[in-house]
Amino acid sequence: MQTLSIQHGTLVTMDQYRRVLGDSWVHVQDGRIVALGVHAESVPPPADRVIDARGKVVLPGFINAHTHVNQILLRGGPSHGRQFYDWLFNVVYPGQKAMRPEDVAVAVRLYCAEAVRSGITTINENADSAIYPGNIEAAMAVYGEVGVRVVYARMFFDRMDGRIQGYVDALKARSPQVELCSIMEETAVAKDRITALSDQYHGTAGGRISVWPAPATTTAVTVEGMRWAQAFARDRAVMWTLHMAESDHDERIHGMSPAEYMECYGLLDERLQVAHCVYFDRKDVRLLHRHNVKVASQVVSNAYLGSGVAPVPEMVERGMAVGIGTDNGNSNDSVNMIGDMKFMAHIHRAVHRDADVLTPEKILEMATIDGARSLGMDHEIGSIETGKRADLILLDLRHPQTTPHHHLAATIVFQAYGNEVDTVLIDGNVVMENRRLSFLPPERELAFLEEAQSRATAILQRANMVANPAWRSL
């Protein structure tokens, strides 16, 4: 039995009462929160280790509700100025094909270093390069070592609508030197591979790794494939996830919105999490709400690619579970939940011309308890409550940018940078303390970053991508 106690911190619990407890303690035993209280009212039990949280705010770990990890090695140049399909077919797919398993291992470690340093403890990795041999094994080995909580949502594509092909051919003319590649699979092959993946990895790493099926989009996956994913999720008591209405092509092809299309086939259910939802109207929001579908909003990525803004306030008003995802490492170019929270608040204030449309409290909920709800994991993570996993972060607000601070939620959402995250626990294990990562010691960090830079350059060269074009002011 291992015990740990965090003492004299300010707890932002995110429990159903949204209690904020000053000068409080949390007691952790074998990876779970077993007790908490206020020092003036109770005495914490003895512990093997005590973390002094004086001057710090203790929060549930941030939950990255939708992301693509490997593409972090494709950021920093080749994606800029590209719309969605241009970016997808001229950067993402060829870039991932040019990666080797050793590159994937470096990408995962780099991603986790940045994520943990911004307070992210859980990620929903939409693995769209799992088709390539060795990539899954390389990623899982690093996830197990690092200690983050991972939903490994294994994506699959089993059809390409002919109406998209002509558009793709035209876009390829922009980058003729880049090889066109396909990640299509036969439906039966995808089923077998995802089943084997789940059998091997679901519940491993002390229960931190989960495996979901992830049909890519309604236009890239057959109805048969989506029905199988839905049944798989039900039979194995997991979720399934899908990219929905990230571009307007889905509706053009179906002649109706993706939400309407899925409802026609009985594919909307409470185990489904959909990402993006940019090209949505009130009818689509109503359909998702009716079927208790969960949502992940990638607000920075959608803006980066010029796609648009999802109707998040309308979903929130209905009480839907909406989490925040940083999305691709190369369509955001950072893995910083605090930065994405700030952008989420600002863009919706601007779009709605309403300075109170999403409160900082709601934004913080979206990054924690609502993010957990969007993953169907709110019984285990997302709040500081007895019985839940000890995924906790300590923020030190004694920085110039967070001084003065009075309203905690507003300070975190609008003033913080991310470097205020001082200590991170996942399953009660300390994976960062005093900004020092357990899986990337300071004496190794510079050499590792140089290796990541070198590997990224080699990937772009193998894919014939131009990462540093001429200076362009317009």
From Swiss-Prot:
EC number: 3.8.1.8
Keyword terms: Cytoplasm, Hydrolase, Iron, Metal-binding, Plasmid
Annotated GO biological process: atrazine catabolic process
The keyword Transmembrane appears for this protein: no
Cofactor(s) this protein requires: Fe(2+)
Activity regulation details: Atrazine dechlorination rates are reduced by aminoatrazine but dechlorination is not inhibited by either melanine or CAAT (2-chloro-4,6-diamino-s-triazine).
CDD domains: ATZ_TRZ_like
Localization of this protein: Cytoplasm
Protein origin, superkingdom: Bacteria
Cofactor annotation comment: Binds 1 Fe(2+) ion per subunit. In vitro can also use Co(2+) or Mn(2+).
Chain residues that bind Fe cation: H66, H68, H276, D327
Biological pathway: Xenobiotic degradation; atrazine degradation; cyanurate from atrazine: step 1/3
KW Phosphoprotein (keyword) present: no
Catalytic activity from the UniProt record: atrazine + H2O = hydroxyatrazine + chloride + H(+)
A Pfam entry, by short name: Amidohydro_1
GO molecular-function term, one example from the UniProt record: metal ion binding
Site feature Major determinant of atrazine specificity, where: F84, N328, S331
One Gene Ontology cellular component annotation held by this UniProt entry: cytoplasm
Subunit structure: Homohexamer; trimer of dimers.
Additional free-text comment from the UniProt record: AtzA and melamine deaminase (TriA) from Acidovorax citrulli strain NRRL B-12227 are 98% identical but catalyze distinct biochemical reactions. Enzymes differ by only 9 amino acids. These 9 amino acid differences between TriA and AtzA represent a short evolutionary pathway connecting enzymes catalyzing physiologically relevant deamination and dehalogenation reactions, respectively. Potential evolutionary trajectories between AtzA and TriA have been constructed, and catalytic activities of the intermediates along those trajectories have been characterized.
Family label: Belongs to the metallo-dependent hydrolases superfamily. ATZ/TRZ family.
Role according to the record: Hydrolytically dechlorinates atrazine to hydroxyatrazine. Also dechlorinates simazine and desethylatrazine, but is not active with terbutylazine or desethyldesisopropylatrazine. Has no deaminase activity with melamine.
Protein name per Swiss-Prot or TrEMBL: Atrazine chlorohydrolase
Organism: Pseudomonas sp. (strain ADP)
Taxonomic lineage: Bacteria, Pseudomonadati, Pseudomonadota, Gammaproteobacteria, Pseudomonadales
